[in-house]
Structure formats: C-alpha cells, structure tokens
Swiss-Prot record:
InterPro entries: GAGE (IPR031320), GAGE_fam (IPR008625)
Highest taxon listed in the record's lineage: Eukaryota
Stored PANTHER family: P ANTIGEN FAMILY MEMBER 5-RELATED, X ANTIGEN FAMILY MEMBER 3
Span list, region Disordered: 1-111
Protein's UniProt name: X antigen family member 3
Gene it is expressed from: XAGE3
Ranges annotated as biased composition (Basic and acidic residues): 97-111
Species assigned in the record: Homo sapiens
Acidic residues bias locations: 29-40
Family: Belongs to the GAGE family.
Amino acid sequence: MIWRGRSTYRPRPRRSVPPPELIGPMLEPGDEEPQQEEPPTESRDPAPGQEREEDQGAAETQVPDLEADLQELSQSKTGGECGNGPDDQGKILPKSEQFKMPEGGDRQPQV
C-alpha cells in the first residue's frame, strides 16, 4: 500500500537578525557610558630619523619574544604523547597478552 498524503514538513521562515553595526555598541551592565580617550599630547608625525630608531627598537624587542614563544611551542605537548604526563608517571600498564578473552565476549577479561 502506498500512502500519497501531503507531507507535514514545512520549513520555518528565516528570521532576519540585523548586523551588530546597526544595533549599536554593546554596554556591560555596570557601564553607563563609554569613556572617551584623552587626546595625545605629542605629535603623531615624528621626524624620519626618529621613526626609524623606534621601529628598530620595536623589532629588537619582538624577536626575543618570538623566539621564546617558539621554544615554548616546541616543548609543549600536543596531547598525542602517551605516558609522559604527570598522571602517567609511576604507573605500569599491563601487557595485552596477560588477558585472556572469553569466546563469548559477554564476560569480563580474566587476569
């Protein structure tokens, strides 16, 4: 017997959510108004010689940070290593040949 009734599936209409730019800035419950930044007292256009010195100093300070980050990443664990964590120290894992599996598979392995 073939049932050719009407399908009960009806797609739900899509709700239109306005983008965050149209809603406005989000405020924390304790914030009443966003605080405005004070205008800078120094000119933002340094002389060409000063700009180069500042850029070189910034590059020199960033390089050791990058090297430290790379060393930390190379030494950090990815989670794929087994038996090297603090929880695994001092534990001896049993060998698989010590267990005898029953034929039926319903019971627990015998040690």
